[in-house]
UniProtKB/Swiss-Prot annotation:
GO annotation, biological process: DNA repair; DNA replication; negative regulation of DNA-templated transcription; proteolysis; SOS response
Its biological purpose: Represses a number of genes involved in the response to DNA damage (SOS response), including recA and lexA. In the presence of single-stranded DNA, RecA interacts with LexA causing an autocatalytic cleavage which disrupts the DNA-binding part of LexA, leading to derepression of the SOS regulon and eventually DNA repair.
Record-stated family: Belongs to the peptidase S24 family.
Protein name: LexA repressor
DNA bind region: 28-48
Length: 217
C-alpha cells in the first residue's frame, strides 16, 4: 500500500469513518470544514493526491463520488464496495429489481436474487438491496445500477436518503420536511425535486444505510 502523509491519513480516516457511520462518503465541503481548509478546492487537491496513490477512486461530477479502494492493514473495516469475502460474517439479502405499481416492495416477483454481503460493511443492518435506476442521486455518489442497502422504516429524519413510494412509483431521494410539507430532493441539478401534494398517496419504504458499487454485477 502507498505511504500517506499525516494529513492524507487524516482525510482517508475521515472518509472511511464517515462511510462507516452514514453509509456514504463526505462531500468536499464537509472535508474542508472538518480540517479548516479555505475552500472545497483544497479538499479536492488532497483527494486527487489520495487517488494518485491508489487508495481512493473519484467519480467526476459527483460531490460524494469517493470510493475507497483499499483499507489500512490495521483496520478491520472492509471497503464498502467490496464483493463478499471468505471468512467474514455474511448477510443474505434480497436484491430488489423493478417494483410493480401498487405491490409490496419485497413481493416475490420483485426479487431478482438473494445476495450475500459482508455484515461488517454496515453500521445499521439492512433488510434488502435495491438496484438504483437513473442518475437523480449522482451527487450523493449513488449511480445508475448501484445496489442501495436499505433498512425498512416508515419514518425518517430530515436529510436522510430514503426509498419512498409516491402513488405507483418508488423512488430514491433525500427527505426534507418543512412544516407540514414533504419534499423529495434530487442530488443532481438535472432533475427536479418532488413535492408531495396534500392528499397524495405517500409512504416510506426504508432508509439507505449503505451502497455497493455496480461493477462486477
Amino acid at each position: 500500500m502507498a505511504t500517506l502523509t499525516p494529513r492524507q491519513q487524516q482525510i482517508f480516516d475521515l472518509i472511511r469513518n464517515t462511510i462507516r457511520r452514514t453509509g456514504f462518503p463526505p462531500t468536499r465541503a464537509e472535508i474542508a470544514a472538518e480540517f479548516g481548509f479555505s475552500s472545497p478546492n483544497a479538499a479536492e487537491e488532497h483527494l486527487r493526491a489520495l487517488a494518485r496513490k491508489g487508495v481512493i477512486e473519484l467519480t467526476p461530477g459527483a460531490s460524494r463520488g469517493i470510493r475507497l479502494k483499499v483499507a489500512h492493514s490495521d483496520s478491520e473495516m472492509p471497503d464498502q464496495f467490496s464483493l463478499p469475502m471468505a471468512g467474514v460474517m455474511q448477510l443474505t439479502l434480497p436484491l430488489v429489481g423493478r417494483v410493480a405499481a401498487g405491490s409490496p416492495i419485497l413481493a416475490a416477483e420483485h426479487i431478482d436474487r438473494q445476495y450475500q454481503v459482508d455484515a461488517s460493511v454496515f453500521d445499521e443492518r439492512p433488510d434488502y438491496l435495491l438496484r438504483v435506476r437513473g442518475l437523480s442521486m449522482r451527487d450523493a455518489g449513488i449511480l445508475d445500477g448501484d445496489l442501495l442497502a436499505v433498512r425498512r422504516a416508515s419514518e425518517a429524519a430530515n436529510g436522510k436518503i430514503v426509498v419512498a413510494r409516491l402513488g405507483d412509483d418508488v423512488t430514491v431521494k433525500r427527505l426534507q420536511r418543512r412544516g407540514g410539507h414533504i419534499e423529495l430532493i434530487a442530488e443532481n441539478p438535472d432533475f427536479t425535486n418532488i413535492i408531495v401534494e396534500p392528499g397524495e398517496e405517500f409512504s416510506l419504504e426504508g432508509i439507505a444505510v449503505g451502497l455497493i458499487r455496480s461493477s462486477g454485477f
